[in-house]
Amino acid sequence: MIEMTEKRLRMIHSALCAYIARLESDRQALAEDDPSFRQFTALINEYTSLKEDIEILLLRY
């Protein structure tokens, strides 16, 4: 059970890393005063926080 949970967490972590990278890339195409820039930044911050929480959980395994 623990191995499966760890495997799932690693898969989620990998997916989050890829998604965050894509969001950062998309954000670079926007001007800083564009409302979408702020939305992308908020999403990046939320997903980065989640990714860090998963990293902490993985350290416990």
Language-model segments: which ranges?
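Short, charge-rich amphipathic interface segments used for partner binding and complex assembly
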Residues: 7, 14-61
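Short, low-complexity cationic-aromatic patches
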Residues: 1-6
